């Protein structure tokens, strides 16, 4: 809304300057010292120019302004509508699996209380084994369905890129046809080609968001602060960027013919359908995998930590119940060193739901959380010719010398859901006693584990269920906010669409008796009045 109003006000200010300049020339026709203001292609600069053509330029520039604002708004609508569609899918998944950290975990703790704490059955326990298996199965199913959403986004990006490239090809061909068209011989027929190109540009804008630049005979389509995909008779098609190490990864780039390499340009497509898909993959889907991963390892580690130091009915020391995957380290392909980097969990209770970037500069490691782009200072020490540094419960180990500007990506939860595994085998006794004295066994560890359901395990401030519900609600709130915005912006498109202006087909006769200054004045007054009507209509509809 504010972007549209600001642009409209800027446009009206420019129109006001033109009108003031025209009035000055009318009131002081012999004053040669008046400063000339160049506004909208020097409208009142050349008095010898054909007045009809110049008046048409005023209308064309106004319509271009309206069209640009309409395209901006439409790109936002497509962006938000796409986000809503994807958020609803994610919201459905989170709602479907909301019982994992409530009912299923509660069933497990209740079974411990019933069989171990109260009934004192510190024996082979099929009931507890079944409850744990139910939790693992639910997590695996969550991972399966989350992967489906990730694959769906990847497929959608690839399919939309095919549409984008098809439109780029068509617009490129039409631009060449328009530039080569014999306008003087067939002055009215070129308008049909221009209208056809405009329709294709509208469609392309809804997919990737573009800016049209027209300057005399030049015609360009640019991405947001980026490359030109149409530059007169040149075109630049886009490509999908994938990864051999991560089948879920998808981005957008182009082939630089000079460097003969593929370059990533995801940041140049911040809005529209494609921008929304990329951002949803980059943010919401990544955040979901990280959040669920954080909850899982907090739960699994809390159980492991006491079961591994407990004793079973035979006095044997217990072991971990769950397998917890280690963080994944990805080295940048641009790194100049060949050092080996690995990562492992050191203190899981300190785990954060974020990925990290590690940057090596001037013999220092700079660690950035990607969730909020905050920088943290790791604790660094050298041991056995290895550089070890810790942050947020993770220990990274680097073997070998690093070079300046080396970059590493740390993904703590990329495999957490997939590799979660129940290590306890059927008919294997649980180790819930805190002593190996077979004559005086107890159930102390079971009592401690039973209390974990109400403990603040996540970020030292939330229970597992509280953290899950909070995250799920944040997705719902985001979706609801977008659903409220979209109808308003759709109405804005309608308002702008109805405010285009045209001039009489018989302009020569209609303006024959008006001098050049009067024509410009009347044209600009009409533009200003129309802009005022737009604002009034917005205020009346939404006040």
Swiss-Prot record:
Main location: secreted
SUPFAM superfamilies: Phase 1 flagellin
Keywords, comma-separated and alphabetical: Bacterial flagellum, Secreted
Location in the cell: Secreted; Bacterial flagellum
Keyword Secreted appears in the UniProt entry: yes
Statement: the UniProt record of this protein carries the keyword Nucleotide-binding: no
Gene Ontology molecular-function annotations: structural molecule activity
GO BP terms in the entry: bacterial-type flagellum assembly
GO cellular component terms attached to this protein's record: bacterial-type flagellum hook; extracellular region
Annotated family: Belongs to the flagella basal body rod proteins family.
Protein name from the UniProt record: Flagellar hook-associated protein 1
Organism listed in the record: Buchnera aphidicola subsp. Acyrthosiphon pisum (strain APS)
Taxonomy of the source species: Bacteria, Pseudomonadati, Pseudomonadota, Gammaproteobacteria, Enterobacterales
């Amino acid at each position: 809304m504010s972007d549209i109003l600001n642009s409209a006000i800027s446009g009206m200010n420019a129109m006001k300057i033109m009108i003031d300049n025209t009035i000055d020339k009318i009131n002081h026709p012999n004053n040669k010292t008046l400063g000339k203001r160049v506004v909208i292609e020097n409208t009142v600069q050349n008095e010898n120019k054909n007045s009809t053509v110049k008046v048409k330029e005023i209308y064309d520039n106004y319509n271009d302004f309206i069209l640009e604002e309409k395209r901006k708004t439409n790109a936002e609508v497509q962006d938000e509508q796409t986000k809503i569609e994807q958020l609803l899918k994610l919201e459905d998944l989170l709602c479907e699996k909301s019982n994992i950290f409530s009912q299923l975990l509660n069933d497990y703790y209740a079974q411990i209380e019933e069989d171990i704490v109260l009934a004192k059955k510190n024996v082979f326990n099929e009931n507890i084994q079944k409850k744990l298996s139910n939790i693992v199965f639910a997590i695996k199913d969550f991972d399966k369905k989350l992967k489906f959403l990730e694959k769906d986004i990847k497929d959608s990006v690839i399919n939309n890129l095919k549409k984008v490239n098809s439109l780029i090809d068509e617009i490129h061909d039409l631009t060449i046809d328009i530039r080569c068209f014999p306008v003087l011989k067939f002055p009215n027929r070129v308008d049909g080609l221009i209208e056809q190109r405009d329709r294709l540009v509208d469609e392309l804008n809804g997919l990737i968001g573009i800016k049209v630049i027209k300057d005399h005979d030049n015609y360009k389509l640019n991405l947001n602060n980026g490359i030109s995909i149409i530059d007169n008779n040149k075109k630049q098609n886009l490509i999908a960027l994938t990864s051999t190490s991560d089948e879920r990864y998808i981005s957008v780039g182009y082939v630089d013919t000079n460097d003969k390499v593929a370059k990533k340009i995801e940041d140049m497509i911040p809005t529209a359908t494609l921008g929304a898909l990329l951002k949803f993959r980059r943010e919401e889907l990544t955040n979901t995998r990280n959040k669920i991963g954080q909850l899982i390892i907090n739960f699994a580690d809390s159980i492991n930590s006491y079961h591994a130091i407990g004793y079973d009915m035979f006095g044997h020391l217990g072991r971990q119940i769950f397998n917890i995957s280690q963080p994944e380290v990805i080295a940048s392909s641009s790194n100049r060193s060949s050092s080996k980097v690995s990562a492992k969990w050191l203190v899981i209770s300190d785990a954060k739901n974020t990925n990290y970037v590690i940057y090596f500069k001037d013999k220092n490691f700079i660690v950035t959380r990607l969730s909020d782009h905050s920088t943290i200072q790791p604790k660094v020490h050298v041991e056995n010719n290895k550089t070890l540094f810790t942050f947020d419960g993770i220990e990274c180990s680097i073997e070998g010398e690093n070079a300046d500007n080396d970059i590493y990506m740390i993904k703590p939860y990329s495999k957490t859901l997939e590799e979660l595994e129940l290590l306890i085998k059927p008919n294997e006794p649980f180790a819930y006693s805190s002593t190996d004295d077979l004559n005086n066994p107890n159930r102390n560890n079971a009592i401690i584990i039973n209390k974990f359901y109400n403990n603040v395990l996540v970020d030292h401030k939330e229970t597992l269920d509280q953290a899950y519900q909070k995250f799920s609600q944040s997705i719902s709130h985001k979706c609801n906010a977008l659903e409220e915005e979209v109808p308003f912006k759709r109405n804005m498109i309608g308002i702008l669409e109805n405010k285009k202006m045209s001039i009489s087909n018989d302009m020569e006769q209609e303006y024959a008796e008006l001098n050049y200054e009067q024509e410009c004045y009347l044209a600009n007054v009409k533009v200003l009045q129309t802009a005022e009507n737009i604002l009034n209509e917005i205020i009346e509809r939404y006040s």
